[in-house]
């Protein structure tokens, strides 16, 4: 039915997006990731809230079209490689990529005092994860609707 298609589309869009967000990857083992929480202008912000809002924290004046221009930088050949595989492969790849984010800052660090290198690391992760998530969602939707 149409309502079932709508529900499935909403779930697909939500899940593909979430699997590319560093705060939505959960490990069964504690890897000692010290960068769990931080402060933004003195207010404690958890890792989850930070990564969900990272695009706005990093680039508060950007609108959606600016993110597209900045992050949609891969060639068609690279996009094809990025979209290879399935959700399981993508999740494993993301979990491995995201493990490094725990060392971007010390627990309780103040975001406004992050170094250029720390901001660069965060922005590189944003670039990759947002682009990969978008490309993979588009590929999945194209696969579904090309039938």
Q: What annotation goes with each model-predicted range?
A:
Residues 37-127:
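An amphipathic alpha-helical core segment
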């Amino acid at each position: 039915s149409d309502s079932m298609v709508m529900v499935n589309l909403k779930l697909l869009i939500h899940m593909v997006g979430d699997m590319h967000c560093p705060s939505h990857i959960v490990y069964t083992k504690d890897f000692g990731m010290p960068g769990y929480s931080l402060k933004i202008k003195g207010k404690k912000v958890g890792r989850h809230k930070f990564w969900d809002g990272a695009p706005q924290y990093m680039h508060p004046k950007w609108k959606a079209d600016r993110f597209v221009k900045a992050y949609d930088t891969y060639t068609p050949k690279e996009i094809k490689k990025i979209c290879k595989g399935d959700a399981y492969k993508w999740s494993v790849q993301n979990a491995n990529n995201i493990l490094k984010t725990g060392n971007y800052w010390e627990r309780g660090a103040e975001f406004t005092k992050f170094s250029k290198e720390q901001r660069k690391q965060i922005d590189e992760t944003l670039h990759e994860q947002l682009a990969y998530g978008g490309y993979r969602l588009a590929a999945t939707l194209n696969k579904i609707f090309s039938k």
